[in-house]
Each structure stands twice: as C-alpha cells, then as structure tokens.
Regions:
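Nucleic-acid enzyme cleavage-core boundary/entry regions
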Residues: 1-45, 50-64, 68, 80, ...
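Structural alpha-beta junctions
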Residues: 91-97
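Active-site donor/metal-binding and catalytic loop motifs
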Residues: 100
C-alpha cells in the first residue's frame, strides 16, 4: 500500500487479531509471512524508519488493538534495533521484543557481525546508563562475543 493512502484510513478492525508482529527487515518479513504467520496475527513490515505517515498508521493500529493483544517487534540485535524498538514503544507501551534476546545472540554469534572496540564500549556505556533495559541480556552477550546479530542470520538456521 502506498504511504499516501494512510491519510484516507479512518477505521481499522482488529477484532480477530490476537497478535501484532512488526518486522524491520523485508526479507525476514516475507519469510515470516510465508512460513510462520498465524491465523489471528497481523504482521506489519516496519522498514526501519518511522515516517510521519507510518507513525500515524501504527498509532491507529495500536489504538484499535485489544488490551490483551500481544504486540511485538523483531529487528537486528544491535544498537539500531534497540533504538527502533524504543521509538516504536513510545507509540505502543505494551510492545515486547521478539527474537532479540541474549539467547539469540548465543545461538547466532558464529554468523554475527564483528564490532569495533569503540562500538562495544559505547554499547556498554549505554547499558550501564540504563538506556536499553529490556535488552540487557542481549547486550551482555554482544559484549561477550564481540558481535551483533543481523536478522538475516535467522534465515540460515
């Protein structure tokens, strides 16, 4: 759907939806929709950047979701993914991370993206400052292995 059509959406019916999943990476989104999407699940391609129109659509979806609807977000396990999560959580306070745990870092570290000492030091400082509390276990594992995990790593499992 072209983003210009968002301005014309006035109502969203989510009565049959029990889970909303936002996925940052297009390839992972496509694969997830084809192989894992559940009947009562709405899967939304996030795309990494929240334009004003995309923010408007996400806010509408969030307002229409039932209180019991599980809403989750999946992105790279790195600073960019943590930032995207925080921005989306500003719109959806009940948002939870999906496949962004320390366990996932351990599972996929052999395919991880090696990071510089500067990157790792900055990430450690962010963790110590409490910047990404939901990702403390993931950050600890990133620091241990010295790598971050791109979503594409999950396609090779």
């Amino acid at each position: 759907m072209p983003s210009t059509l968002v301005d014309f959406i006035t109502e969203v019916d989510l009565t049959a939806v029990r889970c909303i999943t936002f996925i940052e990476n297009k390839t992972n989104y496509d694969e997830y929709v084809m192989s894992e999407k559940q009947p009562e699940e709405l899967v939304v391609y996030h795309g990494g950047f929240l334009s004003p129109r995309k923010r408007k659509l996400i806010a509408l979806i969030s307002r229409r979701a039932a209180e019991t609807t599980q809403i989750r977000f999946w992105a790279d396990i790195d600073t960019g993914g943590f930032r995207m999560f925080n921005r989306l959580q500003e719109l959806i306070p009940s948002l939870t991370p999906m496949r962004m745990s320390g366990e996932c870092v351990d599972l996929f570290h052999e395919h991880g993206l090696e990071r510089s000492e500067e990157y790792l030091t900055s990430l450690q400082e962010d963790m110590e400052a409490g910047k990404y509390p939901l990702f403390q276990d993931a950050i600890e594992r990133i620091l241990y292995h010295g790598v971050t995990i791109e979503q594409e790593s999950f396609l090779n499992k």
